[in-house]
């Protein structure tokens, strides 16, 4: 797995306010844990620890809604 911003299908991050929301999102996707990274590169976004390789992560480039 890898530590990364978990991405939606459009390469957009999951915006957040609470660590609990991200921890739930990340662990549901197979990560060991997650938290809300405040004021990061993509604003307030969920960061996952040890996310499985088959789960999309935010990569450079635009987020397409």
UniProtKB/Swiss-Prot annotation:
Keywords: Amidation, Disulfide bond, Ion channel impairing toxin, Neurotoxin, Secreted, Toxin, Voltage-gated sodium channel impairing toxin
UniProt KW Secreted keyword: yes
GO biological process: defense response
Main location: secreted
Protein's UniProt keywords contain Transferase: no
Expression across tissues: Expressed by the venom gland.
Ranges where the LCN-type CS-alpha/beta domain occurs: 2-64
InterPro entries: LCN-type_CS_alpha_beta_dom, Scorpion_toxin-like, Scorpion_toxin-like_sf, Scorpion_toxinL, Scorpion_toxinL/defensin
Annotated compartments: Secreted
TM spans (from-to): none
Residues recorded with modification Phenylalanine amide: 65
SMART domains tied to this protein: Knot1
Cellular component aspect of the GO annotation: extracellular region
Cysteines joined through disulfide linkages: 12-63, 16-36, 22-46, 26-48
GO terms for MF: sodium channel inhibitor activity; toxin activity
Its job: Alpha toxins bind voltage-independently at site-3 of sodium channels (Nav) and inhibit the inactivation of the activated channels, thereby blocking neuronal transmission.
UniProt similarity note: Belongs to the long (4 C-C) scorpion toxin superfamily. Sodium channel inhibitor family. Alpha subfamily.
Notes on the domains: Has the structural arrangement of an alpha-helix connected to antiparallel beta-sheets by disulfide bonds (CS-alpha/beta).
Designated name of the protein: Alpha-toxin Bot1
Source organism: Buthus occitanus tunetanus
